[in-house]
């Protein structure tokens, strides 16, 4: 401890160097968080047979750029599209530990229909639809932190504060989902899903936008043509994909 003053003196001897170093460290952690989000996003989009008819549609410029919900009916009208869902990365933090929870805001009914690999009793699916502040949590995550249905779950968002400026959110646990097989079960260790309507109304940055759209096509043979049709539909618009 007797050298502490020397450390601080050295740090602030060249303030520009210190600031740039701190910014570099911050950027590294930010990049890690964003890339972890991308990994969770595509992992939760499915693997194997269940994912052979699902596309992820995102903004062409960057996965961090959101898309307007006005695109929804246009996506649904594209030939070969069977169903469309969406999600927004929430940036959840539990118990002051960053990157330990991957939280997404989703439309409950569409999410449950498009992602059957997440197994949950029907009454819990309905509770998720009916509870504005509802959240469903992965089985392994619930076991890890001792979460139970009926609990209040406090989460912070490092991206989306509420309209009152607070980064602290509180949700009601209404369901616990498991994976359809061992691969999906492993992914329940850190995933949670919140009701999109509540998030959309309460977040400070406005409503009516999704991070990505999940598009289910009618047949695996249509994947390439539907993807091309989506890109063509929004080409030269403000929302290129």
Where are these regions (language model features)?
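Alpha-helical membrane and juxtamembrane elements of multi-pass inner-membrane transport
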Residues: 1-5, 9, 40, 55, ...
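Extracytoplasmic
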Residues: 52-54, 70, 96-101, 130-132, ...
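N-terminal Sec/SRP start-transfer signal
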Residues: 1-31
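Soluble periplasmic/extracytoplasmic beta-strand elements of cell-envelope proteins
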Residues: 54-58, 85, 100-105, 134-136, ...
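Mechanotransmission and gating elements of multispan inner-membrane complexes involved in transport
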Residues: 78, 98, 141, 159-241
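Amphipathic alpha-helical segments that mediate coupling or scaffolding at interfaces
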Residues: 10-11, 45, 216, 233
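Diglycine-centered glycine-rich loop/turn motifs
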Residues: 111-137, 142-143, 148-155, 183
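Hydrophobic, regular-secondary-structure patches
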Residues: 26-104, 108, 120-131, 143, ...
